[in-house]
């Protein structure tokens, strides 16, 4: 089962995702962190999220790309909720850090790149009780450089590709919640 939480940065997505994860009824709750810390601002953001989770019963895995690898590190994955924070970081990491995929996004309209990530996410979702995915949706701006515009487009493509697979989609930008019945 997949729950997708979409919003703008600092919109409360993380707090909502944690609430869903902790109240989901599964005995184990994994926080799957995708952020690569590269500077002091990243350290502060990571520390803020760690503090939010402190004492709540999460165990943490840090996997910046190829998130389907998390399954092998989870004891009894079928009884586990996984909170993936966040898809935005994952897309950037796949674009720049994954040695096998970092050029894939440049080859076509992005379909092969987004399909590869979607495949990883669906494999993870098929192996765990509940996968909660936190993601951003950014507004495009003509002043952004080409690579940034590509990143925004790829993230949006992946968000749209996930929606049909999600049991519920919560869009904090519009305040809507859709339950699809998947």
Which residues does each predicted region cover?
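Conserved P-loop
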Residues: 2-75
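Generic beta-sheet signal
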Residues: 3-5, 29, 78-89, 131-133
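Short, glycine/serine-rich, charged loops/turns that create anion-binding
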Residues: 10, 36, 88, 138-139, ...
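Residue-level signal for inorganic ion chemistry
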Residues: 17, 49, 83, 136, ...
């Amino acid at each position: 089962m997949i729950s997708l939480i979409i919003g703008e940065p600092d919109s409360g997505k993380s707090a909502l995702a944690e609430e869903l994860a902790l109240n989901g009824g599964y005995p184990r709750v994994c926080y799957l962190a995708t952020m690569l810390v590269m500077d002091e601002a990243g350290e502060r953001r990571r520390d803020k999220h760690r503090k939010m989770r402190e004492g709540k019963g999460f165990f943490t895995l840090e996997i910046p790309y190829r998130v389907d690898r998390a399954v092998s590190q989870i004891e009894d994955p079928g009884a586990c909720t996984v909170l993936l924070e966040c898809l935005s970081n994952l897309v950037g990491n796949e674009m720049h850090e994954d040695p096998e995929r970092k050029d894939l996004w440049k080859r076509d309209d992005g379909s092969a790149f987004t399909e590869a990530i979607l495949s990883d996410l669906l494999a993870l979702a098929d192996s765990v009780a509940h996968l909660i995915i936190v993601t951003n949706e950014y507004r495009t701006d003509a002043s952004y450089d080409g690579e940034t515009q590509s990143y925004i487009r790829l993230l949006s493509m992946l968000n749209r590709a996930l929606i049909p697979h999600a049991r519920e989609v919560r869009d904090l930008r519009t305040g809507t919640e859709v339950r699809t019945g998947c």
